[in-house]
């Protein structure tokens, strides 16, 4: 009987996890994950350096033509247009962080490194 209880508890945990993955992310939501630095090249040869949060799958709204709604987004490109933004993120590399995604959209071009582009964000305190 104990085994059946453990199996049922496991299925419930899986269902809860799947339900959480199905919630579409919106502007103003919190993204939590590991911060990493990605270096790649644009098809025109330009070097790209991007800060990304890697997190659990998050669904994007179905109305965005650039997203694959059936597959959750796991990489979030935090735009760092200023030296201050880069300086804020650099000591957090490799760590678990949370940011408020003030603005976000599905990646549309080769300049967007990851599933979702986050042009405006705020680091949240631990």
Region roles according to the model:
Residues 57-66, 125:
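Short, surface-exposed beta-strand/loop "edge" segments at domain boundaries and coil↔beta transitions
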Residues 53-55, 104-126:
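OB-fold/S1-family single-stranded nucleic acid-binding modules
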Residues 5-15:
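Bacterial N-terminal signal peptides
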Residues 19-21:
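Boundary at the C-terminal end of the N-terminal hydrophobic targeting segment
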Residues 64-88:
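Beta-strand/loop nucleic-acid-binding surfaces
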Residues 83-99:
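Short nucleic-acid-contacting surface segments enriched for D/E, G, S/T with interspersed K/R
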Residues 26-59, 101:
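Structural detector for short beta-strands of small beta-barrel domains
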């Amino acid at each position: 009987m104990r085994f059946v209880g453990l199996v049922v508890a496991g299925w419930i945990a899986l269902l809860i996890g799947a339900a959480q993955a199905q919630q579409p992310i919106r502007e103003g939501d919190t993204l939590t994950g590991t911060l990493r630095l990605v270096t790649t090249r644009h098809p025109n040869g330009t070097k790209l350096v991007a800060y990304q949060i890697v997190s659990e799958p998050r669904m994007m709204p179905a109305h965005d033509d650039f997203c694959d709604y059936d597959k959750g987004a796991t990489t979030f490109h935090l735009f760092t247009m200023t030296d201050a933004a880069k300086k804020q993120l650099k000591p957090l590399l490799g760590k678990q962080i949370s940011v408020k995604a003030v603005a976000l959209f599905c990646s549309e071009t080769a300049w967007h490194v990851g599933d979702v582009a986050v042009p405006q964000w705020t680091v949240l305190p631990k």
